[in-house]
């Protein structure tokens, strides 16, 4: 598995705080049953969410689901 860095995720969502919130929202979606958009393996939901974000599978618009 490739190592995930904050810098990879910040390329998609430049604001560190919004990036954290977006990954948290996506991880919650995965933990309650949403299908991962990548090969999840045995990773935890937050790791899956960060990998998805680094691969540009979602963006900051996910924050609109909580507002």
Curated annotation (Swiss-Prot):
S-adenosyl-L-methionine is among the record's keywords: no
UniProt KW Nucleotidyltransferase keyword: yes
GO MF entries: DNA binding; DNA-directed RNA polymerase activity
Catalyzed reactions: RNA(n) + a ribonucleoside 5'-triphosphate = RNA(n+1) + diphosphate
Alphabetical list of Gene3D superfamilies matching this protein: 3.90.940.10
Family matches, as InterPro entries: DNA-dir_RNA_pol_omega (IPR003716), Pol_omega/Rpo6/RPB6 (IPR006110), RPB6/omega-like_sf (IPR036161)
Keyword vocabulary terms for this entry: DNA-directed RNA polymerase, Nucleotidyltransferase, Transcription, Transferase
Role played: Promotes RNA polymerase assembly. Latches the N- and C-terminal regions of the beta' subunit thereby facilitating its interaction with the beta and alpha subunits.
Protein's name according to its UniProt entry: DNA-directed RNA polymerase subunit omega
Organism whose genome encodes this protein: Nitrosomonas eutropha (strain DSM 101675 / C91 / Nm57)
